Amino acid sequence: MMTLASNKRKLYYAEYLANVPEYVVDDDGNRVISYITDDGTVIYAQTGEKKPVYSTPQEMYVNYAESGGEAEAKEFGLSVADYEAILLYGAGEYHLKESFLVWADSQIEYEYGGEEIEVEVDGETIKTKAPVKTSADFVVLKTPRSLNFERAILKAITK
């Protein structure tokens, strides 16, 4: 199934990377330096807590429909009251997964003043601008697939 380009809307998505230590930040949102090692490596102060970190948001063009409501119908194993929107896109076009973030109308905000940070995921170091989770409009609940197209079922994030 092809989706019409004229029906597509530009949205942004970010992949969940990992739970990482939370850094101490100053009044401007920049990380506070704890110390610098002899070889010049900067070590930032940590709060002792962990929080989820997401990849730098990427744009996507998808069919977007707000839905949900009070009906008792169930689709994809969810009541329509459990989700607020659905994305539809061609098979293999995007690789959205559960817990990804999606921005439809809100401005993307970044942790640490937009400074790029490094996150280690499965032994690989990934650089990200670390978007703020609550700046996103939705989180992906499910991604049912079919032969020619894929869907992403979205739940609104409380702001």
Language-model features: locations:
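Short, intrinsically disordered N-terminal pre-domain segments
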Residues: 1-20, 159
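Short, conserved turn/kink motifs that form compact alpha/beta structural patches or helix kinks used as
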Residues: 3, 25, 30-31, 36-159
